Amino acid sequence: MAPPSTREPRVLSATSATKSDGEMVLPGFPDADSFVKFALGSVVAVTKASGGLPQFGDEYDFYRSFPGFQAFCETQGDRLLQCMSRVMQYHGCRSNIKDRSKVTELEDKFDLLVDANDVILERVGILLDEASGVNKNQQPVLPAGLQVPKTVVSSWNRKAAEYGKKAKSETFRLLHAKNIIRPQLKFREKIDNSNTPFLPKIFIKPNAQKPLPQALSKERRERPQDRPEDLDVPPALADFIHQQRTQQVEQDMFAHPYQYELNHFTPADAVLQKPQPQLYRPIEETPCHFISSLDELVELNEKLLNCQEFAVDLEHHSYRSFLGLTCLMQISTRTEDFIIDTLELRSDMYILNESLTDPAIVKVFHGADSDIEWLQKDFGLYVVNMFDTHQAARLLNLGRHSLDHLLKLYCNVDSNKQYQLADWRIRPLPEEMLSYARDDTHYLLYIYDKMRLEMWERGNGQPVQLQVVWQRSRDICLKKFIKPIFTDESYLELYRKQKKHLNTQQLTAFQLLFAWRDKTARREDESYGYVLPNHMMLKIAEELPKEPQGIIACCNPVPPLVRQQINEMHLLIQQAREMPLLKSEVAAGVKKSGPLPSAERLENVLFGPHDCSHAPPDGYPIIPTSGSVPVQKQASLFPDEKEDNLLGTTCLIATAVITLFNEPSAEDSKKGPLTVAQKKAQNIMESFENPFRMFLPSLGHRAPVSQAAKFDPSTKIYEISNRWKLAQVQVQKDSKEAVKKKAAEQTAAREQAKEACKAAAEQAISVRQQVVLENAAKKRERATSDPRTTEQKQEKKRLKISKKPKDPEPPEKEFTPYDYSQSDFKAFAGNSKSKVSSQFDPNKQTPSGKKCIAAKKIKQSVGNKSMSFPTGKSDRGFRYNWPQR
């Protein structure tokens, strides 16, 4: 057993400090330290005693032979198992370790012991982390309408039930309030949930270096006077239609209004110098103002314009609204805290654009990725010159980047995050929620100073890291809010995330339910999670219930809008059930890999069951590439025409876009102007040059040479052009074209020869057929032969031969006989001493004194025997007459 951790006494002593002086933590011990010391001594003594026991082997077997030692071991073993069983039972583990067999279940006992140790040590680690503050005990946050299960209270457990009721009543917090009047009803401008792109709400641009586009500055004033026909449509849709009518540039409409200012923004030199951290004022001494009127908002804006920096944070609610609502805005300066009721001042918040877009004032945010989009969506507010402490924490490589960690690290303040998911639409706000919102910005300016100082010290007096943080914060300020747009394929994105396979009916139901949920959420201004959560929608699509009660059975708890419109949903399910039941992988574009069919295996020569190089990763089959390869078409959910078999039309074979072995032809150049991608590909192809081309002028991208330098004798170009004449470009082109033309003629001649050989082979008659035809012709001649006719035929043949023109005979040459009197007859003698010829004579015998008698006999015997076959027919039938020795 390992000794306890060194931080355990510190934690237990801290817990003992909360107890009263007269109360003991454990019986017999005044505090936790004394108990830890006693337990540690006992553990050390037990460890030493266990080391003195006989070791397993011959020594243990010898002692085991004595009955007294055997009885002692069994007694102590039972005591240990009983203690272990109690400890395991206390921690909720399986505690039947003592009741098992001693021989057959030894491994099971060991497994139980290992599992129990893991559970106990994990629980000890969690409790130590909670005591040291690393991991706080998070209280559950549940909706207000959720009914907590109640225990049946009787006379025997009434006290326990009352105690549990008191303890559990403090653990639940509100996620959303049930009986709140919707703040959307009080807004002066109706919320735009239409399925159109988001248009910026800004119509006045303070601190502008580039004026606001005319399409945005005049849109609010044009609608009531100049466009009365658009009064019955949503404002955003009316603006969008008007822009399409007047053909105004969409780039100006949807561009970031402060993009020019942000691109040309540079932080001041003062914020890049070494800072002097200014300690925050105690929260009890800092005044806090709740802004809920227009006059107070204007006064706040004037105060902010006189500050050098201020901190900003937002509280957002997204459960009971389609696009979400910004319910609260907190602003803190060095001396004051402000909380703005943005639900009440929603239409007047544009006033703060004057201070938020001032490039001379630093705005400090923490995790502003969502805050920037919320400010644009609800108020038309934009931020210039922002410092994001979240990006600074990432650059400093801190352990965690949350605001809770920064408060604990720099300010030693423990923040309570139990109201993070609270319903911020509640009015009036409780004091606890106001205090939570105020803490988010009260300490942020001091954290901003401390982080700047730390980055300055890490940069060795150089503001490199500070500039990186401002650059990242500027990129966040350039973000734009994008409204969710519904399309016919929107459901596929959610369907692919679920990793479930649906057939055609289920997929159709999923598509119809997704469209119904989107339409209902936009109309009722509710979120997707409130109308119909994703898991419930997928469950209904999988089950396809036949009755409305089945739809309700798939939802627990049942959303209110589902219960109200259950009949409409039932009609959608019936419509989906009428679809033909087919596989949905091809329709939905979900690729599913599988083995090749048997027909493809037979046709494909290169197929191997374990050869992965020929199997594409997306599961499409491979077909032989001898013919033309089909091209994959664009997938569609409901095709108008019935497509052919997938195996024959959707073969994906990768082909090189750029290759070294293709020369650009004249036909490709005549097709038309090249796109940007084609030009890039052409440039890459031109870069693949033959290494021997370096001595020839390049065909393209020539270096600019002045014409005067070519005719100036003092220049190097003139000298090179006169001394070394290189091949001209046109000559190279002509040679290439000649080679191509010759190759084309050769291929055409080869093809023609192949066709001629093929035709001759088809018309050729085999040898057997020729013999049969000759025999048949001979039989016919014999049958029809007559002596008179034969004589006539012979005479005709003689006449034909005589009529043939004879070739002219060559002139006769004069014959001169050879004079043998002048010849040397000694050359024919065997032993004559004539001149030795320089040429080798194979028939010439070498003179030798001793002659080999055996070789002579062998030659005579071989010469006397005949190796020929006898002529005539044999009397022994079909047997051959082989020569005998």
Swiss-Prot record:
Changing residue 19 to R: No effect on sumoylation by USP36. Residues 776-885 are annotated as: Disordered. One of its GO terms (molecular function) is RNA exonuclease activity. Induction: Down-regulated by mild hypothermia (at protein level). There is a cross-link at residues 19, 583, 710, 826, 833, 859, 873 (Glycyl lysine isopeptide (Lys-Gly) (interchain with G-Cter in SUMO2)). CDD domains: Rrp6p_like_exo. SMART domains: 35EXOc, HRDC. Mg(2+) 1 binds at residues 313, 371. Arginine-rich dipeptide repeat proteins expressed from C9orf72-derived repeat RNA interact with EXOSC10 and inhibit its ability to promote degradation of this RNA. Pfam families: DNA_pol_A_exo1, HRDC, PMC2NT. Its EC number is 3.1.13.-. The keyword Magnesium applies. Changing residue 859 to R: No effect on sumoylation by USP36. Its cofactor is Mg(2+). It is found in: Cytoplasm; Nucleus; Nucleus, Nucleolus; Nucleus, Nucleoplasm. One of its GO terms (cellular component) is nucleolus. PANTHER family: EXOSOME COMPONENT 10, POLYMYOSITIS/SCLERODERMA AUTOANTIGEN-RELATED. Catalytic component of the RNA exosome complex which has 3'->5' exoribonuclease activity and participates in a multitude of cellular RNA processing and degradation events. In the nucleus, the RNA exosome complex is involved in proper maturation of stable RNA species such as rRNA, snRNA and snoRNA, in the elimination of RNA processing by-products and non-coding 'pervasive' transcripts, such as antisense RNA species and promoter-upstream transcripts (PROMPTs), and of mRNAs with processing defects, thereby limiting or excluding their export to the cytoplasm. Belongs to the exosome component 10/RRP6 family. This is Exosome complex component 10.
